[in-house]
């Protein structure tokens, strides 16, 4: 009997031990699963309000908007002051909805884009979580917001003394800046501005009219309290005296009030032969500077067809996730003008020399491309851009929108860049030929599409500081200092050359150096730079930072500096 009892007791003990062991193992398995899943709960919180604001603003930024609405819609929401790494308990649902926000439009990709983005490329926001802030977060805006309303003493336009005709010159963004300057000049000299004529004779030979590129009626109405604008000269004024005048570059208030305004005593129609850089960047009355910003960021909006197509391109880029807009300035005319030929064949370099020699209005003919490059005066090559993006830490599946005309050398010239970044997109890849049909053969309209996609990008990087790069950077500053990385071309080419010569065996050191250099070149708020020391005359003005590259302090005010972040 005693043996049976002992046997029963032992059996009971063993059973309890087994049950306890099973419970412990179950608990360990449960904990192991959660240890694996937990990192997903710590994914960075994507502020949907921020992206929704920007997606909606593709439409809004081209509307005539009040200073109050600019403050509300264009500055970062207060919620954006919450750290990107937020409470793990609440982040899982927000993360899932954030992902759907970025990938639910994949059906918008046109049929000829043969492969849809892989799941890894769509979810690029989750790769390298600790680096999310470094790669995508905008710099602190320090509570700077647009402030473009005129002072209380600002009056309606005075009685017009005559008509100002304008022949713009250059590409899209050079013409845009010139038009905005002419609006301000018309105010200074009490002129009625006739809707400007776009450049049809320069390198691009674009036949677009003002109304093809811009919303003409909106332009006229938006400026009605500043100047009088008409579509064309009235009939029956053939007898009026006319004059063609080359306004002096970078001229100030006194030049226009005295020398130009005095011409009304003799002439009733003044035609400005050129529009580029005719007004000084600095030392103008605050109301004139604010008028330039109202003209640029409110009145001069793109035509309906361009805005609609631009919105579509942005939506299609957003379907791939967060994206970089890369202004890759490597077109034939750019290389010919600048004399830059690094990485080109002998025949290609010779072709560019012929173009430069045969283009009459390009004054400098003999250019040493090697010297230009080492001084940082050349656009980065596609290969150099690829090294830059890699050094900054962007993964190979990062969507990159190429904002450019026809790349010199075609697709083969992009091989080095594509070997590092496979998701290279462009308007030609995002849209069908039928969708782009009305814009083709019109370089100004195609550039306007690139402008919209660049403004709305998560990160903007120009390979060269030309007119578009400056215009986009200034607009992004105006919209809340969106992340804009300005490459130090001089430093980059020297570091890249070290790799090419084999002088640097460890590429990581080069990458670290490039990364370090660009930590302070990401579009943070700062005052516009003045002239370079030691410069005089026209060269002094040219060395200044362009007004439209950085409209601070004239058109951006700090709201409650004590709360700046």
Curated annotation (Swiss-Prot):
The residue ranges crossing the membrane are 17-37
- Single GO cellular component term: membrane
According to the record, glycans are attached at: 62, 73, 104, 124, 190, 441
Subcellular location(s) per record? Membrane
Top-rank taxon, per record? Eukaryota
Q: Which InterPro entries match?
A: FucosylTrfase_pln, GDP-Fuc_O-FucTrfase
Chief subcellular location equals membrane
The record's annotation in PANTHER family points to:
O-FUCOSYLTRANSFERASE 7, OS02G0726500 PROTEIN-RELATED
Member of which family?
A: Belongs to the glycosyltransferase GT106 family.
- Name by which UniProt lists this protein: O-fucosyltransferase 7
The species this protein belongs to is Arabidopsis thaliana (Mouse-ear cress)
Give the gene symbol: OFUT7
